[in-house]
Amino acid sequence: MNSKLFSPYTIKNVTLKNRIVMSPMCMYSSGNEDGRVTNFHLIHYGTRAAGQVGLVMVEATAVLAEGRISNKDLGIWDDNLIEGLHKTTTFIHDNGAKAAIQLAHAGRKAELGTNAFAPSAIPFSDTMKIPVEMNIQQIKETILAFQRAALRSKQAGFDVIELHGAHGYLINEFLSPLTNKRTDEYGGSPENRYRFLREIIDSVNKVWDGPIFVRISANDYHPDGLTVQDYVQYTKWMKEQGIDLIDCSSGAVVPAHIDVYPGYQVQYAKHIKEYTKIATGAVGLITTGSQAEQILNDNEADLIFIGRELLRNPYFPRIAANELGFELQEPHQYKRAPGKIHTNK
């Protein structure tokens, strides 16, 4: 049986063997608090590659040490961190998948016991510290840090990079009027609030020639915040700059109640794709092969990002293939266990 989920997908100069992406998920497992890859990361990502995920995306990886969410985050702020990341990409590639990395700065959500930095001195909540408002020099240094991180990503062997512009972290904080109250060239109008991301993309493009994704929070879930329609304009600008795909998540820029249900964020991938003609990724409570297949067949997204379901079962692609009646070529080491995989779900 043919399956769109298990069809190859080419984006720029990279071809994925199928359309399943391991969504970036923080593991908080850099044990020595130095940003380095550990054996856990090799097993964690390598297992999903062996499980036949098409694109394995490494978790939010900090471009600056002070930009970590926690002191156990992975980092890419120094050349001495390349070696561990290169081992990770090699392990992923050896198991038949492509490798991506999400480049991130936590902004006001950094919880390191030191200063957190943001576009404006507004805390995320009453229980979190007031961040330091970034000056122009700090903004320029952070933009340069993203560029250097992109170059290190290339040296580490990654095929794709994703800029983390969602979930209330630094890029998202500049984009949203809820968190950006600046009166200089980086605040105010949508064009000015986009300037930080624009300059990051321009800077990254100078050193990176592979596909670039951007993860967005397509809804702030606040009456004065951004909606998916605001992100249509942002996405048009990103597309003009050469961004290849928008990974459509939502929320977390401010505390908010979110009604969560199966595929609740697919609507954003569909909307962005329809109104900007850019490739999109759907993410959020996509848990079965038939659900993923339907999203693709309905042309609501181009790639399917799977998060928690891959934590539950790193061999989700095999289960999805069985469900869809698609014969998936398993690793030769596992050929003694052909046929259907049974679950208790």
UniProtKB/Swiss-Prot annotation:
Biological role stated in the UniProt entry: Catalyzes the reduction of the double bond of an array of alpha,beta-unsaturated aldehydes and ketones. It also reduces the nitro group of nitroester and nitroaromatic compounds. It could have a role in detoxification processes.
Transmembrane segment boundaries: none
GO BP annotation list: response to toxic substance
Enzyme nomenclature, EC number: 1.6.99.1
Source organism of this protein record: Bacillus cereus (strain G9842)
Residues the record lists as binding substrate: Y28, H164, G165, A166, H167
Coiled coil (residue ranges): none
Family note: Belongs to the NADH:flavin oxidoreductase/NADH oxidase family. NamA subfamily.
Taxonomic lineage of the native organism: Bacteria, Bacillati, Bacillota, Bacilli, Bacillales
Top enzyme category: oxidoreductase
InterPro entries: Aldolase_TIM, NADPH_DH_bac, OxRdtase_FMN_N, YqjM-like
Binding site for FMN: S23, P24, M25, C26, A60, Q102, R215, G307, R308
Cofactor: FMN
Keywords: Detoxification, Flavoprotein, FMN, NADP, Oxidoreductase
An MF annotation (GO) of this entry: NADPH dehydrogenase activity
Subunit structure and binding partners: Homotetramer.
Entry protein name: NADPH dehydrogenase
Swiss-Prot/TrEMBL catalytic activity: A + NADPH + H(+) = AH2 + NADP(+)
